[in-house]
Amino acid sequence: RRERYKSQDELLGVVQKFRTLGVPIDGIIQDWQYWGNNYQWNAMEFLNTGFYDPQKMVNDVHGLNAHMIISIWNSFGPMTKQYKELEKINALFNFDTWPQSGSEKWPPRLDYPSGVRVYDPYNPAARDIYWDYLNKGIFSLGMDGWWMDSSEPDHFNPKPSDFDTKTYLGSFRKVCNAFPLMTVGGVSEHQRMQTSDKRIFILTRSAFAGQQRFGANTWSGDVVASWAALRNQISAGLNFSLSGIPYWNSDIGGFFLWNFKDPLKNADYRELHVRWMEFGAFCPMMRSHGEGAPRELYQFGEKGNPAYDAIEKYINLRYSLLPYIYATSWNVTSRQSSMMRALVMDFAHDKQALDINDEFMFGSSILVNPVTQPMYSKTEVKAGDSVKVEDFSIVKSKNVYLPKGNDWYDFWTGEKFNGGQTVKKEVPLDIIPLFVKAGTILPVGPKVQYATEKKWDNLEIRIYEGANGEFTLYEDENDNYNYEKGAYSTVQFSWNDKKKTLTIADRKGSFPGMINERRSNIVFVGKNKGTGNDAIEKFDKVVNDSGKKVVIGRK
C-alpha cells in the first residue's frame, strides 16, 4: 500500500491498524531494500537492521490472519552470495540494469556504480541457485508469495552488442521476450517441488505466453497517476486477458504521483484514487501500491470522510463477492475461462459492444463501467495559490451501454433495463455503474475481516429474474493443491424462469473441513430489494440443506 515499509514494525503496524479499524485485509507486501545497501541487492536475506527478527515478523503477520509477500528481483549485487555462485557458471549478463548506483539513497550517485547484474534464468543450474537461496533465506520463514519485480528485465542504455549476450539457450536477442516466463517459471516450479501445502502466488511486472500456468498475476507496471492512465488501464487489462493470461491488475492510484502536489490533500488525486480503487475491486487482483504518498485508506481521512467511506465500501464489496470470485477463479482453472472479460467475449453478436473499451464483464454476470474522469473537484485560489478542493454539490452522471440480448439489473437500485441501449447512471463518489445480467444467481458472502474468517454456511443467494441461469458454487481447503486430487466440492444452483423455480442440486465431492449443512437465504432482486452491499433484513425464502437436492418455488 506504499512503495515499501522501512522496518518490520512499520509493516506490522499497518496490518494491526486495519484490524483495529475493522477494514478487511488479506495480504501485505514488503518491497525492496530489506536486504540493505545496493551492493547486497536482492541478497534474499534481511540485512537491513530495521528487520531485526524476520521470523517474528512473518509469524506476527500470520497471527493477524494475513499473508506476507516480498519483493525479489532477477539481478544481484556484487557482494551477494548468489552473484559469486552465478558468476562461476557464467550465468550473469553484463548489460546495464537497475539499480545503477551503489547507494540506496535518492537521487542515485552514478559515480558509485552498483555492479548489479541480471542472472540467466534460461540456465537450469542458475534457476537452482536462485531457488536455493530464496528457499533458505525467505521461504523457510513461511513467506506466502513473491513480488518478482523487473521481470523483463530492466535494461538501461541498450546497445546492439547487449543482445549478442550469450544465454544458456542462445543469444539474448533470440530469447529475450521469454525472460519473464523463465524466471517466474523457475520460482514456481521449484516451490511446487518443495511443497504442495502452500499455493504459489507470484506478482510479476512482465509476462510471456504460457505464464498463466505458474500461479502468476501480472501488474501493469509503474504507471504515472492520471485520469488518462486510469482509462488506459481498462483496455490494457482487457487486452491482456484476451491474450490468454487471466490474472492481471494495476497499481491502484497509480505508482508515480508526479502530476499531483501534496496528493493526499489534493482533491483531484483523492478522487482519482477512489475511482481507481472502485475499478480495482473488479480486477482479478485488488492491490494498492505506489510511491510519493502512503495509500492505506486511513491516509485519506477517517470514517465519515467521503474518500475513506468510498474506499472502505469497495473493499467490503470485494469481500462480499468472494463466493462469486472464487467460483470464477475455479472456472479459470478448470475451464480455461477468464475473470476480466472484454464485451466481445460474451456479446460477439452485438456490433455496438465490439468497440467499447471502457466497460467489461467481471466473470460471467457483472457488467462494470468504471468512472474515469474527474467530477467532484474544483479549483480555488487560496493565499495566492490555486488548489483543488472537493465539490459534491451536484451529483454527476455517466452513460452506460447495456449489451443486447439480455435484460440488466442495476446492482445498486434493483431497477431492470432492456439490453441494447445506453442508459444514464448517477455516479456520486461511492458509486460506479454495475449491472447484473438477468438470469444471474449471485452468492453474497458474510462480512469478514479476512477471506477465510467465516465458513460459507450462511450465504445470501440473489436471483435476477428474466432468464434461465446457473451458478456453480465451488469450495476447497483454500491453500494447498489437494483439489488436484479431487478434494473439493461443487453445488449447482439452477433458475428456471418459466417455472419460477430454483433448484439446488446434490453436492458433488468433498474435502477435509467441508461444512455439512448450509443455509441459503434467497432474495428475488427487484427495485430497492436485494441491492448493493447492504444487509438484507428479510429474505424471500430460507433453505437449510445438507447437500441433497432441493427445489424451491418462487411463491
Locate each region found by the language model.
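Catalytic-domain carbohydrate-binding cleft regions of carbohydrate-active enzymes
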Residues: 1-431, 436-437
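Solvent-exposed beta-strand/loop surfaces of large extracellular or lumenal domains
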Residues: 409-429, 530-555
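Accessory, solvent-exposed terminal regions and/or long lumenal/extracellular loops of proteins
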Residues: 431-548
